A protein has these predicted regions:
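Intrinsically disordered, low-complexity terminal regions
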Residues: 1-47, 101, 106-109, 115, ...
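Alpha-helical adaptor scaffolds
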Residues: 71, 75-79, 83, 87-95, ...
Length: 185
């Protein structure tokens, strides 16, 4: 019927909008022509290595090396080396190393250390987080581990069980205390 066709048309028009909201960013929509897709229900037993992008909706039991963007809504049991990583409702067990950005979205759980240039964490992380530049710990985040960065932003509601240290900062904090309390008078 015409009523049913209108419902289908509305769903088709709304899907790109929903997909963009789910991913939370315009920057991850631009996957290249050389993208590898691991569909939901697919299980890969072994390592994956590609010069392109990867989108994982299924499960990978092995290490993943990706020269491009890695988008995960599935599960990875293994170490990850990539340029940028975007995890939304993902489960990751293993080390994450990214030369660019790591975004751990709400509903994602990662067990393993994270090393990247920048990061945004809204999910759960059990492991140390070492970020060369800025890290944002969102209000929905749970981090069990130490955080090292240049800049850190912790939003109200975030849970951190560990230490935060700005080791990559250019500020010499010892300089503020070199003359003791007398320098404040």
């Amino acid at each position: 019927s015409i009523k049913e066709l209108k419902k289908i048309d509305k769903k088709e028009v709304r899907m790109p909008q929903l997909e963009q909201e789910l991913r939370g960013s315009d920057e991850i929509i631009g996957l290249g022509e050389d993208t590898t897709y691991i569909t939901k229900g697919t299980i890969i037993n072994g390592n994956i290595e590609t010069d392109g992008d990867i989108e994982i909706l299924g499960r990978v039991d092995g290490n993943v090396r990706c020269a491009g963007k890695l988008i995960i809504s599935g599960r990875i049991n293994g170490d990850i080396d990539t340029t940028d990583l975007y995890a939304e409702a993902a489960n990751i067990t293993g080390e994450i190393r990214a030369s660019g950005t790591v975004k751990i979205g709400t509903g994602s759980v990662t067990v393993g250390n994270i090393t990247a240039f920048t990061a945004s964490i809204a999910g759960a992380v059990k492991g140390d987080v070492d970020i060369a530049d800025a890290v944002v710990i969102d209000s929905t985040a749970v981090v069990v581990g130490n955080i090292k960065s240049r800049d850190v932003q912790v939003n109200s509601g975030a849970i951190i069980e560990g230490f935060c240290k700005q080791v990559h900062s250019d500020v010499d904090v010892d300089q503020f205390f070199k003359n003791g309390i007398e320098s404040l008078e």
